[in-house]
C-alpha cells in the first residue's frame, strides 16, 4: 500500500497549542487519574491463540488477554488503515464522502471533531504518539505533546537484494519482495525501535506528575511480511494449510472480490489470477512470523509497564485497525466487506475490573472513544458518535446488537448473526447485495440476498441499514 508519510521519518514534533473548542483542565497524579496505554497493531486479524487459533505463537498477547476483557465480535468501521484510524480516533462514522481510503485524514475529513488524544490533552494528560497511530504522521498534530516515528525506509528491508530493488521508499512498485526472512535482531525492523521508544517513555512518565495517554503504533503484520528469522522458525511451512474458504462462490457478487492491488504491487506476486499454492503458503507463513514478532515487541512494553509500577493505574487498549484476508475467499489484504476484513481484535485491560472475561456483544471501533472517556472520568464530546461499552466491562449486558462498516460503495450491517451488505450509488440506491446468516454459514459461502424466500428479510435489513449508517451518510462534505 502506498504511504503518505510526507514529513521526514523520525520527525519529532513537540507542540503545546491546542484547539480552542474546550477550556483546558489540569489533572495531576495527586488525584490518581487513570493512565492509558493505547496499542494499535497494523493489519492484525483475530487469528490469535487467545481467540482459539492454537497454531499462532502469541504468548504476550495471550497474557494480556488473560488480564483483560476480550471482545469476540469487534468490528472496524472502515477496512483500510488510514480511514479506520481516523474514524476511531475522532469517534465518527464513515460516510459516502468521508474516511474513504488509506489517504484519509482526521483533520481534513472531520475537522469539527475533537479527537480522542485531543480530549485527553485538553484534560491535562501528556499525549505521545509513537510509530503508526494516524496513517499520516502529521495528522491531528496539535493533539500530541510528542510525535515520533523511526528513521529509515518505510519498507524496512534488511536483505541487500530487497534494499536495492526497493528504490522508492513509498512504493512497492520498486519490485521488492512481499516478505523477508532475515537473520537479524529484533531492533533491525521498526517495531523493535518502536518498542524501545515506548519503554523509554514509560520510564520517563513514571517520574511525571501528569497522567499520560501513550499511543504505540506497531507496524507488523502489515506488508511486507518482514520479520527476523527466529520468528519464521516458529512455524513449519509443511503444516500450513490454505483456508477452508479458499473459493469464490458464484452466488456472491463479483463486486465483492477485488484484485487485492496492495499485494499485487510487490515484485514477486503475479499481477492477476490465483496465487500458486506454494506462494500462498509462504505468504501465510510470513504473516504468522510477523504476528509473533510484534507479539514479542508488545510484550517488552507491557513488561516495562509492570516494572515501572504503572500497571495498576493504567488502562491498556489493544486493537488491530481492521481484519485481513489470508486467502479467505481467494482474497488477500483488507478492502472488502467480508467478516475476515471487518472483524478485528479488541482487548481492554482495566485494573481491578477485568480478569480474562470474554464478550460476544457486538461493538464498533467508534465505541472505544466514549468508553475511554467514561473510564477516566472525562466528558465525551458531542461529536463522538459511538456507544460506550463500559457496561460490558462492569459485567452488565450490552443492549447494542449491531455494527455498520463501509468500504467505498459497500456498506455492511452486522446485526446479531446476520451479515448484510449493499453496494450503493451516490443516491443510496443499491446495485448489488450480499446476505449471510452466520448461524448456519459462518464461512460466508451461501449468499441469501437474491433468494426469493429471503426478500422480506432483505427489505427489513435494507431499511435498518439506512437508519443506522448515520443521518449524514449521503451528504457531500463541502468544508
From Swiss-Prot:
This is Ulvan-active sulfatase. It is found in: Cell membrane. The active site is at residues 81, 135. InterPro entries: Alkaline_phosphatase_core_sf (IPR017850), IDS (IPR035874), Sulfatase_N (IPR000917). A lipid is attached at residue 18 (S-diacylglycerol cysteine). It comes from Formosa agariphila (strain DSM 15362 / KCTC 12365 / LMG 23005 / KMM 3901 / M-2Alg 35-1). The modification 3-oxoalanine (Cys) is found at residue 81. The keyword Transcription does not apply.
Amino acid at each position: 500500500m502506498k504511504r503518505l508519510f510526507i514529513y521526514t521519518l523520525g520527525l519529532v514534533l513537540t507542540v503545546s497549542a491546542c484547539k480552542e473548542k474546550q477550556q483546558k483542565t489540569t489533572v495531576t497524579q495527586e488525584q490518581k487519574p487513570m493512565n492509558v496505554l493505547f496499542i494499535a497493531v497494523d493489519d492484525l486479524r483475530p487469528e490469535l491463540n487467545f481467540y482459539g487459533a492454537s497454531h499462532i505463537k502469541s504468548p504476550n498477547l495471550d497474557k494480556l488477554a488473560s488480564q483483560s476483557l476480550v471482545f469476540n465480535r469487534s468490528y472496524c468501521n472502515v477496512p483500510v488503515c488510514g480511514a479506520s484510524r481516523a474514524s476511531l480516533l475522532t469517534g465518527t462514522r464513515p460516510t459516502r464522502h468521508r474516511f474513504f481510503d488509506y489517504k484519509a485524514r482526521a483533520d481534513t475529513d472531520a475537522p469539527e471533531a475533537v479527537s480522542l488524544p485531543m480530549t485527553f490533552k485538553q484534560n491535562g494528560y501528556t499525549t505521545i504518539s509513537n510509530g503508526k497511530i494516524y496513517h499520516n504522521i502529521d495528522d491531528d498534530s496539535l493533539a500530541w505533546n510528542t510525535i515520533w516515528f523511526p528513521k529509515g525506509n518505510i519498507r524496512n528491508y534488511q536483505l541487500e537484494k530487497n534494499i536495492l530493488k526497493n528504490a522508492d521508499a513509498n512504493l512497492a512498485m520498486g519490485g521488492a519482495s512481499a516478505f523477508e526472512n532475515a537473520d537479524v535482531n529484533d531492533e533491525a525492523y521498526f517495531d523493535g525501535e518502536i518498542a524501545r521508544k515506548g519503554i523509554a517513555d514509560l520510564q520517563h512518565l513514571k517520574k511525571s506528575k501528569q497522567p499520560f495517554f501513550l499511543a504505540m503504533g506497531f507496524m507488523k503484520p502489515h506488508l511486507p511480511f518482514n520479520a527476523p528469522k527466529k520468528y519464521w522458525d516458529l512455524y513449519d511451512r509443511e503444516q500450513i494449510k490454505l483456508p477452508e474458504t479458499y473459493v469464490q462462490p458464484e452466488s456472491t457478487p463479483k463486486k465483492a472480490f477485488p484484485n487485492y492491488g496492495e499485494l499485487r504491487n510487490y515484485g514477486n506476486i503475479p499481477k492477476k489470477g490465483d496465487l500458486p499454492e506454494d506462494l500462498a503458503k509462504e505468504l501465510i507463513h510470513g504473516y504468522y512470523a510477523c504476528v509473533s514478532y510484534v507479539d514479542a515487541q508488545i510484550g517488552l512494553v507491557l513488561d516495562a509497564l509492570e516494572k515501572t509500577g504503572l500497571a495498576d493505574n493504567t488502562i491498556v487498549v489493544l486493537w488491530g485497525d481492521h481484519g485481513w484476508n489470508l486467502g479467505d475467499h481467494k482474497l488477500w489484504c483488507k478492502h472488502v466487506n467480508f467478516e475476515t476484513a471487518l472483524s478485528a481484535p479488541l482487548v481492554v485491560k482495566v485494573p481491578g475490573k477485568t480478569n480474562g472475561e470474554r464478550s460476544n456483544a457486538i461493538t464498533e471501533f467508534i465505541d472505544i472513544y466514549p468508553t475511554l472517556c467514561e473510564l477516566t472520568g472525562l466528558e465525551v464530546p458531542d461529536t463522538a458518535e459511538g456507544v460506550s461499552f463500559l457496561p460490558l466491562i462492569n459485567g452488565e449486558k450490552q443492549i447494542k446488537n449491531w455494527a455498520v462498516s463501509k468500504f467505498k460503495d459497500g456498506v455492511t450491517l452486522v446485526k446479531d448473526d446476520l451479515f448484510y451488505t449493499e453496494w450503493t450509488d451516490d443516491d443510496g440506491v443499491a446495485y448489488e447485495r450480499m446476505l449471510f446468516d452466520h448461524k448456519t454459514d459462518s464461512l460466508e459461502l451461501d449468499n441469501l440476498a437474491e433468494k426469493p424466500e429471503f426478500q422480506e428479510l432483505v427489505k427489513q435489513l435494507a431499511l435498518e441499514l439506512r437508519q443506522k449508517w448515520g443521518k449524514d451518510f449521503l451528504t457531500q462534505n463541502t468544508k
